[in-house]
């Protein structure tokens, strides 16, 4: 992700904090964890007034939907019952919490989180290299020697090309000599791991979606809508309050238990498609993230399909 895109994403997070505070404080006590939002505020200050207004509109659009799904946000049990709004550190994602914004009521030991995205739908950008064991990192099953025997010579060559300062666009054989064999080795390795360990499908989705349930919030500027999507895999979302029930019901979604198919996308040498049971499917597109050749690549991982009981609502901007 470019520095510009990163700043836009952080600015959108800041706009959501502002809008949430404004809407919540009309009903009950709320504070912001100021230290947690320093980076987001810094990014906010780099945006134009037009951009700031756009982020605020995008943030405002989904809040009524959030409140209808989560009555515990507005419920108040006395003056000591205070909502805290905070932004997670980037390092939290490394430990499995993919939520960006967290809404907490410490008095009742309750919190929910939002994963914020601005104009993109990637589930994750995961790096591959000659030393990164994606199997161990993603689903706890180390990659086999047959995988390493294919990919290590490729990344060794890329390291040599980097030392010669070769640009990716000058590497005319990269699809056949780099992308295709790495994706092919990836496909064979995951299929091999699944044969040995049937829990791979659920572990993979847990790696991509984290250890806590959350709502994904995507601002789509061109359409002027904010997509609100539930990932209620453990039943942590949609809790009723003491006196108020949720008016928007969020069902629990089932994790996958089977790999139906893992293969190359038709007519592609750089993208794998994974089809699982219970409605899950994903694409893995390998790409370079730099101008000069380097001995690592990234997978742009996106959901092609999710279970029908993952609720998606398009919230129009005012």
Predicted regions, residues:
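Short, positively charged
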Residues: 1-98, 104-111, 115-318
